[in-house]
């Protein structure tokens, strides 16, 4: 659903080209587990009893057998008591008056179950890709692991037939996120490997801490990436494993979620940290709309009893404690892995309206032309 491309580009003379063979490995797609339990047995407004699993931020964000990013990463911070953004009341009132979307667009908060997280062992060799478009120096140019049996967003393999086709791969201490990835014909006999923009994330690095400042904040202010906000996708996805663990445990997934927004409800210029880029090309929202990078929190007084399942209440309780980041334009959806559809459905949180949310105070506001992306792309 991305509409992101940087408004400022600097051309380069060519791309990095590295060739390597692919190795056969076991793929864990979605890194999923058991699904959530049935309704009943607990007070739907209170977290179920039980010990939470350990993990970053006191939670359970363990993907491909390891944690993603240091525990003080922005999406692991509990913001249930955080101050509101000064614009919160005006923006949320304006959004509520118009609803999540216009007639003809989606008008209720849904869940997009099209994402897949691919787990590559260190024995998987890397394969070079050819970049489509002129997205430099924003995008990384290093080769990418492609485990056999893997797939991109919205596909059953690595062949992209249209859409965003995000490729998400964990390998060792790196997370590779490639926008519009395509292996012609898929693997193992596929042809050319292409993609529009690659963001490589170092899982040991704190990109958003207090010592990080513009223009070198995160991967660089004004720098595009795998999604408009240039925030990592995989750590903020809903997964079946997390939902099941939360239903059986403390009732909360201990990280922020990500969501996309109808284009005319998304501010057309500027962004707020931790985002480092804004949705561009199709977004038309004015000053009373949400900026890219906004973090919304479900109101603490929202009555969870009316939600349809324990799994839906897990999502809502997570939104009360960790919120959801606005990462791109397109339509009004939370993002989830395909396996999470066994525990939830598209309408699980459809009762949540704009009036039920608040905009939490974020980081620095960045204007459309405050910076030009300045970074050295990763090439190996």
Give short role names for the model-derived ranges.
Residues 6-18:
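N-terminal export and membrane-targeting signals
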């Amino acid at each position: 659903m991305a509409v992101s491309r940087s408004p400022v580009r600097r051309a380069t003379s060519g791309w990095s080209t590295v060739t390597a063979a692919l190795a056969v490995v076991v793929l864990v797609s979605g890194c999923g587990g058991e699904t959530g339990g049935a309704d009943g047995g607990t007070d739907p407004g209170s977290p179920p009893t039980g010990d939470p699993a350990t993990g970053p931020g006191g939670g359970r964000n363990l993907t491909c057998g390891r944690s993603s990013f240091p525990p003080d990463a922005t999406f692991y911070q509990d913001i249930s008591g955080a101050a509101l953004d000064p614009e919160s009341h005006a923006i949320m009132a304006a959004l509520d008056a118009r609803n999540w979307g216009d007639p003809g667009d989606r008008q209720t908060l849904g869940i997009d179950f099209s994402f897949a997280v691919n787990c590559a062992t260190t024995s998987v060799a890397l394969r070079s890709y050819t970049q489509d478009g002129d997205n430099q120096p924003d995008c990384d140019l290093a080769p990418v692991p492609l485990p056999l049996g893997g797939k991109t967003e919205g596909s059953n393999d690595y062949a992209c037939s249209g859409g965003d086709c995000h490729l998400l791969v964990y390998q060792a201490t790196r997370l590779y996120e490639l926008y519009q990835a395509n292996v012609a014909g898929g693997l193992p006999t596929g042809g050319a490997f292409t993609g529009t923009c690659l963001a490589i994330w170092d899982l040991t690095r704190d990109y958003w801490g207090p010592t990080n400042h513009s223009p070198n904040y995160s991967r660089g202010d004004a720098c595009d990436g795998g999604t408009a906000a240039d925030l990592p996708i995989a750590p903020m996805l809903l997964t079946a494993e997390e939902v099941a663990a939360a239903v059986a445990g403390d009732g909360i997934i201990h990280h922020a979620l990500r969501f996309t927004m109808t284009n005319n409800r998304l501010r057309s210029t500027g962004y707020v940290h931790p985002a480092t880029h804004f949705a561009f090309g199709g977004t038309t929202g004015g000053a009373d709309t949400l900026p890219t990078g906004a973090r919304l929190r479900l109101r603490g007084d929202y009555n969870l009893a009316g939600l349809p399942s324990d799994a839906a209440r897990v999502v809502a309780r997570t939104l009360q404690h960790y919120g959801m980041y606005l990462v791109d334009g397109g339509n009004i959806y939370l993002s989830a892995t395909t396996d999470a559809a066994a525990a939830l459905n598209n309408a699980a949180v459809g009762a949540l309206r704009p009036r039920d949310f608040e905009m939490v105070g974020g980081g620095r506001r960045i204007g459309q032309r405050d910076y030009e992306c300045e970074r050295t792309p990763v090439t190996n």
